[in-house]
Each structure stands twice: as C-alpha cells, then as structure tokens.
Amino acid sequence: LARGLEALGARAVRLKWPNDVLLAVVGDFAKLAGILIELSSDRRGSQAVIGIGLNLLPPPEELPQPAAGLAQAMVGAPERHRVLAAILQELAAVLEAFAVDGFSALKSEWQQRHAWQGLPVRLLGDDAVLLEGTCYGADDDGALLLETAAGIQRIFSGDVSLRPIPPGDLLRGAGSPLGVRGT
C-alpha cells in the first residue's frame, strides 16, 4: 500500500505495526489507511482476504485519533481508479515476494518506513497499558520487537494497539500481555 501511494507521488508515508499506514504531519502522525487480512488454510492451500481502507480526503470532523487523507500527502490527489491500479500493482509484487520468502523479503523496506523505529512506545489492550519499551521494528516473521526492562519481547498479537509515549510519560512495570514472548 505504501509503495503504491508513493508511486502516485505521496510523501511522508509511514507504517505502524501491525496494519496501519500513517502520514507524517507537523510533529505527529495521522492515520491514512488500514489493512485487515483474514487467513485460512485447507487441503488446497492457504487463502487470504485482504481489506484496505484508504482516506482520500481528510475527515470533516475531529476523530479520537488523528486521521489524514491522501489529498494531504500529495499535490493534486489522483483519480480513484489510478489509486486502485497503483495499489493493486504493488500488492501483486508484494504478495509474490511474500509467497517466496515470507515477511523477511519485505523487512528492510518495512523498517525504513516504520513510524516509531527506535522510539519509546506503549502497547495497549482493552484500554490498559500492557507493555512499554523501545520499538525496534519487526523480525523476519513480522513480530514486533520491543525492548523492555526484561529484554527484547516479540509481539505476535494483532489485537493490541501501539502508541508512541509522550516525553516524560513513561510508566514503570507495565505487565506482559498474552502473545508476548521474550527472546
């Protein structure tokens, strides 16, 4: 998705684990797009249903989390069919690489776009702080790498929310959630 948007001329596109595309705006990030993937496997192999939501225009009202539109990421937003074509072209290339080498084929590119690489973050679940530490991107399996007082934690669950920690707002001793494994 980020590749396709950049091919259209979008700038300041960043990624947030596990499935958001952000736009860097003055001093912050705003959600530009989200991706949901449902996987299933049977005797015929694996299948995926991929849903993509992309804001073409900024939202008309304030939302709980900052949101952006594609029109803010570029001069002159392209027509919808051009946006779809660019996204599908890049999606085909990414799925092909993933089929051969898994996430490791995309890891370096993902890390370069990672919004909070090397920054303090908080992992939230059910509106509670589960864990906080320094975010170091993702490993070859796509698990989030979070350095905490207990060491490097691998986060697998996509049912959590990752947020930056404002300066001076670190909690101490946040617990360890399900789906977190030390390395």
Regions found by a protein language model. Give the residues of each.
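Catalytic beta-strand/loop module used to bind and position nucleotide/cofactor moieties
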Residues: 1-183
